[in-house]
Amino acid sequence: MLGRLAVRQAVRCSKASIKPVNTHQLCLRNFSAIRRLSFVAGAQCRPYHTTANMLHRTARGEHGMAACGNPSAAVKFERLPTFAEPTHYNVRLSPCLNQFSFDGHATIDVTIKEATDVLKVHAQSLLIQSVSLITQPGDASKSLETSYDDKLNILTIKLPTTMQPQKVQLDFKFVGELNDKMRGFYRSQYKDKNGTEKFLASTQFESTYARYAFPCFDEPIYKATFDVTLEVENHLTALSNMNVISETPTADGKRKAVTFATSPKMSSYLVAFAVGELEYISAQTKSGVEMRVYTVPGKKEQGQYSLDLSVKCIDWYNEWFDIKYPLPKCDLIAIPDFSMGAMENWGLVTYREIALLVDPGVTSTRQKSRVALVVAHELAHLWFGNLVTMKWWTDLWLKEGFASFMEYMFVGANCPEFKIWLHFLNDELASGMGLDALRNSHPIEVEIDNPNELDEIYDSITYAKSNSVNRMLCYYLSEPVFQKGLRLYLKRFQYSNAVTQDLWTALSEASGQNVNELMSGWTQQMGFPVLKVSQRQDGNNRILTVEQRRFISDGGEDPKNSQWQVPITVAVGSSPSDVKARFLLKEKQQEFTIEGVAPGEWVKLNSGTTGFYRVEYSDEMLTAMLPDIASRRMPVLDRFGLINDLSALLNTGRVSIAQFVQVAASSAKEDEYVVWGAIDEGMSKLLACAREMSEDTLKSAKQLVVKMFEQTGAELGFAEQAGEDSQKMMLRSLVQARLARAGHQPTIDKFTQMFNDFLEKGTPIHPDIRLATFGVVARYGGKEGFDKLMNLRETTTFQEIERQTMVAMSQTPEESLLAQLFEYGFEKNKVRPQDQLYLFLGTGATHMGQQYAWKYFCEHIKEFLDKYGGANSSLFQRCLKFAGESFGNEKRAVEFQDFFCNCNVLSDTDRQTLARPIGQTVEAIRLNARLLESNRQIIENLLKQSNV
């Protein structure tokens, strides 16, 4: 997202209602400095690490890396001074969609709290035409001199004299660009039903992009009310956070001025506008809130599912939080070009089309459940984030972690068909653990020294780990107590700002426990524990010895000797679905006694997999559980947790691939999608190692996979059966896809037949097995299959199918076809920038694909930086990771690291920004290499013993 590209000077629209600016009002010696605002782009951010001192070992990262760059060249960050704060904005913008520009006029009511002779605001990529000051209503404005820091995006305004505490008003006139970088006030492009190219304008202001649209105090602590007027062409729809209160024609009659009601107090990153040819469907909540879903023409019917869900969601949150949604309306709008999944602007929530729109006959179950989660996530932000906002980005998790948790609470309670808490285990818990097990992770409460670092923390720590820790705390305190604490927190800090300690205080008051003491270790230090457990029998009691240490994927030592307070739940074989005992582990090692456990009865920690920790069992304890895993008597949440822990322990060397395969083989009768997903992940590690060893080894490993998956695949078949739930079709897709990738010819033939019947006879492919079908065609269909997929992508109008064809085609084993795909997507720009990272997604399927993707990234890094807006763009950082993380040897790790050290396209600030993403990718490559070296002989022996 972010840009260091030159932004061309905006071309102004000719509009009678915008008065020409008297440029003689400008101080000439400051004009060039101000004008640079339209040509430079400084340090910015947004979603998904902090200053990591280039690629050195740092206090916040432990993974040693070769030094490169010049740390002293990093820009020293400076926040706005606290001697002044805004109370109200009046913003009037006049966008010209076809000229990609807008004129602006903004006033800011400012309270000066301490004597000062300057005021400072943020502005970026704006041509500031005049700045003036009004000290008393009715007084003449005074033109002011300014200077601009293009590194900090701070406009310093020199006051006519030292001013004592008082209220003043700043007045700005400016011109800006409707950019194509999906940040600030930007343009989005689409084609109508006749193939005509159209544009709409939308916004993305989180984290620091409101300054692209108007001068402002662009930090979350500065809350103010907003009046917004948008001057647009008569045939266009204009939207903002609040409801429309007037529409008046301009003097020439060609445009209209749309004025919106005054907003509640909110941070600048939550302001939003949208302008374009839009249509909508609407409904009302029980409390009378007008809900609308807006789309480009021809797609509004696809918004019905989200509209119905959003109505239910607002009503449910009103009750759960015991605070009514305070605005009269809430619009949800699908934007064709959108870098995030969605953005929670108060009253005008923006989404990618794929994250909001559902076609009942085309959307897969998995995607439909994701839409439900995203809709619920953004609407939860209306309380967590909008009503109560973090003071600074260090506490970003206060909004993202709780919105992530509440989305599951809502969908779990209102959409039981998705069995969403099962998917939570892999999508949230395992995802958060996967990143947090790296030495190059970061704490949930991560120090943000510079907003340039923000992009890298919109990641699985801020979202998935925070979400999982909230779930653990909710189970520990109980949902009613947890809810009571959250209500207290929201009511206490509504329309204001908070820090993590404020939340712990509210939860402590609600529970009567010291929640800060319990939870600070989980949010202030990176990583999480693995509990090593052993046992002994004492009559009818079981004595457990539990030792905690930080779980690190490379199996090495924790230099910080981290320690947590760990809520432990225990289940036993005689009553596997119940919690037999609860303990709180406070020391490095403790003994716990469980009464009434018969000799030979299994004992499992982390009952229900509610805790954010892994468990390493003695061989005796693990063996005792195998029969109940095989019979599925052990609950599904626990089966997943056990197998997922074993899969993660593979990398540490504490579990071998042979041990994992033994447990996986005991699950031959497994019937749950999420458990098979954990098995599939572990077998993927076996296949990745085998691929690095030799073609013969890979062939034998694939035969072992077929042996494990074949029976289940035969039982499932390919067709949906009457009465089965949504999870069964997803399981069918997972198992059959794995068989096909392992070279099982009958499965490949069946997928191929299904695809041909779809093209030739119009026989529909079930949405839940469509991606697997496309993947088989790309892998085994040669150029003919590739061309068919390309034609399908060119002719479809549905984004999920567009994305699935891209992911599938990137798996081709033919370099010429992969080159064609990359040229199509990147060089011809046939794929939207927000979706281009999917072109990397399947390349790790082959050695050729790995090497091609990495080489392509290296050769085109400048284009990627320009296209995505700089090194701190989340899109750029994710492409960087996808291009390298599937490698599996030390040579590649060094090559990857050295490239970024020596790349002359990158500045020292870029390297500083990329330190953690690069470190995480290098660490992932080395983990792959370590897994291979520790299991090479074990794999050879395993394959021989398996007679494959």
Swiss-Prot record:
Residues annotated as binding substrate: E206, G341, A342, M343, E344, N345
Q: Name one Pfam family in it.
A: Peptidase_M1_N
Q: Gene Ontology terms, cellular component aspect?
A: cell cortex; condensed chromosome; cytoplasm; extracellular space; membrane; mitotic spindle pole
Q: Where is the active site?
A: E378 (proton acceptor)
The GO molecular function terms of this record are: alanyl aminopeptidase activity; metalloaminopeptidase activity; peptide binding; zinc ion binding
Q: Which UniProt keywords apply?
A: Aminopeptidase, Chromosome, Cytoplasm, Cytoskeleton, Differentiation, Hydrolase, Meiosis, Metal-binding, Metalloprotease, Oogenesis, Protease, Zinc
Q: What happens when the gene is disrupted?
A: RNAi-mediated knockdown causes an arrest at the gastrulation stage in 30 percent of embryos. The surviving adults lay a substantial number of unfertilized oocytes. However, brood size is only slightly reduced. In the gonads, the pachytene zone is expanded in 15 percent of animals and oocyte nucleolus disassembly is delayed. Mutant 1-cell embryos have a delay in meiotic exit during which chromosomes fail to decondense after polar body extrusion and oocyte and sperm pronuclear envelope formation is delayed.
Q: Which InterPro entries match?
A: Aminopeptidase_N-like_N (IPR045357), Aminopeptidase_N-like_N_sf (IPR042097), ERAP1-like_C_dom (IPR024571), M1_APN-typ (IPR034016), Peptidase_M1 (IPR001930), Peptidase_M1_aminopeptidases (IPR050344), Peptidase_M1_dom (IPR014782), Peptidase_M4/M1_CTD_sf (IPR027268)
**Known catalysed reaction(s)?**
Release of an N-terminal amino acid, preferentially alanine, from a wide range of peptides, amides and arylamides
Per UniProt, subcellular location reads as:
Cytoplasm; Cytoplasm, Cell cortex; Chromosome; Cytoplasm, Cytoskeleton, Spindle pole
Q: Where is this site: Transition state stabilizer?
A: Y463
Activity regulation, free text = Inhibited by chelating agent 1,10-phenanthroline, aminopeptidase inhibitors actinonin, amastatin, and leuhistin, and to a lesser extent by puromycin.
The alphabetized list of GO BP terms reads: anterior/posterior axis specification, embryo; embryo development ending in birth or egg hatching; exit from meiosis; first cell cycle pseudocleavage; maintenance of centrosome location; oogenesis; peptide catabolic process; positive regulation of oocyte maturation
Residues reported in the UniProt entry to bind Zn(2+): H377, H381, E400
Q: In which tissues is it expressed?
A: Expressed mainly in intestinal cells in the posterior part of the intestine and in amphid sensory neurons and nerve ring neurons. Expressed in neurons in the male tail. Expressed in mature spermatids (at protein level).
Q: Which cofactor does it need?
A: Zn(2+)
Cofactor binding remark: Binds 1 zinc ion per subunit. Can also use Ni(2+) and Co(2+).
Q: What are the EC numbers?
A: 3.4.11.14
Q: Which PANTHER family match?
A: PROTEASE M1 ZINC METALLOPROTEASE (PTHR11533), PUROMYCIN-SENSITIVE AMINOPEPTIDASE-RELATED (PTHR11533:SF174)
Protein purpose: Aminopeptidase. Required for the exit from meiosis, probably upstream of cyclin cyb-3. Involved in the establishment of the anterior-posterior polarity at the embryonic 1-cell stage by regulating the dynamics of sperm-donated centrosomes. Plays a role in oocyte maturation. Required for embryonic development.
Membership in a protein family: Belongs to the peptidase M1 family.
Protein name, per record: Puromycin-sensitive aminopeptidase
